[in-house]
Amino acid sequence: MACQKFIVGVIGLIWYNRCMMTGNKLLNPDHILKEIVEIPYGSTVADLGCGAMAFVSLAAAKIVGDQGTVYACDILKDVLSSVEAKARQAGLYNLKTVWTNLEIVGATKIPQEVDYTFLSTTLFQAKNHQAMFKEAYRLTKPGGQLMVIEWKASSGPIGPAQELRVAKEKALSLAQQVGFSLVKEFEASDSHYGLLFKK
């Protein structure tokens, strides 16, 4: 049974990555950043757990412009190298890659003055969710916002195994425990929920 769940999860992630790379996106970063979060030019953004494709980081770097900064943070150094190459190819010199372990509070070495912090499809890959929310809170400046996007509890075979997914109610509780206040909930896609918080 465990093997079957693992295989389903792997197949789902492969399908997900293929969709994202071919443009048939499950998530639309531009819509989320411009229409839901409404990130303005010149903002500072931290994408915690950016991943190899770095959809949030790359989209944010285009929006915030030369006067803004985007920190693409991840624990895998090869991922960061890939993201940096994509940014340079796109001429996005305001994007900076940062190695970190998000499950250790204080490990992310960037200024604690982030306007918009993102935890996007990252929680399901981790164990210490509380530490991740504490780190997000530490980095976000007073009045700044946190965006959480995660897989819905039951969204079919696409994505990670069900037992790895973090329910919306749990994410909401964890964020509020560290001091964030909920601004709004939204449908990030048919397969993802979204939560927007303010510090």
Which residue stretches match the model-derived regions?
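A short SAM/SAH-binding and catalytic strip from SAM-dependent methyltransferases
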Residues: V114-H129
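Core SAM-dependent methyltransferase catalytic element
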Residues: V178-K199
